[in-house]
A protein has these predicted regions:
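PP2C/PPM-type serine/threonine phosphatase catalytic domain
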Residues: 1-115
């Protein structure tokens, strides 16, 4: 499988709050991993939220020894969200920050997606 990823801030916004991760090789026990996050426009630290959420999800998936893709992804999302919420509460400059998140992995002829 070959993959390609690109992101662009567009012509209106100065800052691109999008972030992505794309790996067509194994990440932990998943054979591949694709993630897109879009920091909430207009909210504080949206760029930080999208980047760090993806970095935490990738780290969690990499360390997870499980073999059930849904559980691996769900656990990674929950851990990343807990950290993001805590940071938002502890640091006023990040108060209210957030991001959307879409994760996919292809195993055999099945696509697993979390949104």
């Amino acid at each position: 499988m070959k993959t390609f990823s690109i992101t662009d801030a567009g012509i209106i916004r100065e800052m691109n709050q999008d972030y992505y991760f794309s790996s067509d090789t194994a990440v932990g026990n998943l054979p591949n991993l694709f993630i897109v996050a879009d920091g909430m426009g207009g909210h504080k630290a949206g760029d930080y939220a999208s980047r760090h959420t993806i970095e935490r999800v990738v780290a969690s998936v990499s360390r997870n020894g499980g073999d059930e893709p849904v559980s691996i992804i769900k656990e990674a999302i929950n851990k990343a969200n807990e950290i993001l919420v805590a940071e938002s509460r502890e640091d006023e400059t990040k108060s209210g920050m957030g991001t959307t998140l879409v994760i996919g992995t292809i195993i055999g002829n099945k696509l697993f997606v979390a949104n």
